[in-house]
């Protein structure tokens, strides 16, 4: 990690976005984190991929060290931000790997700007986020927003040590390499990110068929907290016919943290088969 670089680029709306980059001569792979995480949470994945790829970890708006505007946290804005970072760094047809919120961002980017990604990989982008069209707001939706607001607010009253201890109690199988960045990301999180709860829904049936690149969905076990169900995976594949689906057993929503070795095996295999074989070269 000593030779990794960090910096800022200006993206959409004049905002500054922080990134870390492994460098090297390999094809570019961009990592898009989930809600409340930041780019540093990808450190173990970046370390594993760095010998073969030029890995770029981006902090989304309101997360990590990127700017945190008061508004603009819809997935459309996040996708435009990520496209801007990719352009500013001069990356050509990068593979984009996104988890949860980052997975939804990656899908929107690939559908809206199909010439940007060389391949996309989605780690448990929630079935709720893949729902087709708009629907009425429900009591369950309102309660979910209230819980999220209370959780984000509660983070600010805890020290790094308290955050790590609390998460370790919930996920004792996570490594220290995961727990440290996880806690750091929560301490850097801006409350403004709660604005994403008021963002309009995405018209997925209209957007997703425009995705032209190879695509992979990595799923896990709903009984352990994974968000994408088998039905949700089938619905997504119906809209993105080239989508490959890889299931990682005994894992929940944070698949890479629960089953790191198997997760990296799946990611490496897809990148080698569908991305490097396409002749993508370093920027």
How should each PLM-predicted stretch be described?
Residues 241-283:
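Catalytic active-site module of serine/aspartate enzymes centered on a nucleophile-bearing elbow/loop
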Residues 1-16:
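N-terminal cap/lid segment of alpha/beta-hydrolase-fold proteins
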Residues 98, 102, 106:
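Gly/Ala-rich beta-loop-alpha elbow adjacent to hydrolase catalytic centers
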């Amino acid at each position: 990690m000593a030779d990794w670089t960090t910096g800022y680029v200006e993206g959409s709306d004049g905002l500054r976005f922080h990134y870390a980059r492994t460098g090297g001569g390999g094809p570019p792979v961009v990592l898009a984190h989930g809600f409340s995480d930041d780019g540093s949470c990808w450190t173990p994945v970046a370390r594993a991929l760095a010998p073969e790829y030029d890995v770029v970890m981006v902090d989304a708006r309101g997360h990590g060290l990127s700017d945190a505007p008061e508004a603009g946290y819809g997935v459309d804005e996040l996708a435009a931000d990520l496209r801007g970072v990719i352009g500013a760094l001069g990356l050509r047809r990068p593979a984009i790997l996104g988890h949860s919120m980052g997975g939804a961002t990656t899908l929107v980017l690939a559908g809206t700007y199909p010439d940007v990604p060389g391949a996309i990989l989605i780690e448990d982008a929630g079935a709720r986020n893949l729902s087709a069209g708009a629907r009425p707001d429900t009591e369950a939706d309102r309660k979910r927003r209230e819980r999220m607001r209370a959780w984000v607010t509660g983070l600010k009253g805890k020290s790094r040590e308290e955050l790590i201890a609390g998460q370790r109690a919930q996920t004792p199988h996570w490594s220290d390499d995961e727990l440290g960045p996880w806690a750091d990301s929560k301490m850097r999180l801006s409350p403004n990110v709660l604005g994403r709860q008021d963002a309009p829904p995405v018209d997925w049936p209209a957007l997703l068929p425009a995705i032209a690149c190879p695509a992979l969905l990595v799923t896990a076990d709903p009984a352990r907290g994974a968000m994408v169900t088998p039905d949700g995976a089938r619905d997504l594949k119906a809209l993105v016919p080239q989508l490959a689906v890889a299931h990682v057993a005994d894992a929940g929503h944070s698949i890479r943290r629960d089953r790191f070795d198997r997760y990296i095996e799946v990611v490496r295999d897809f990148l080698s088969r569908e991305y490097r074989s396409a002749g993508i070269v370093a920027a």
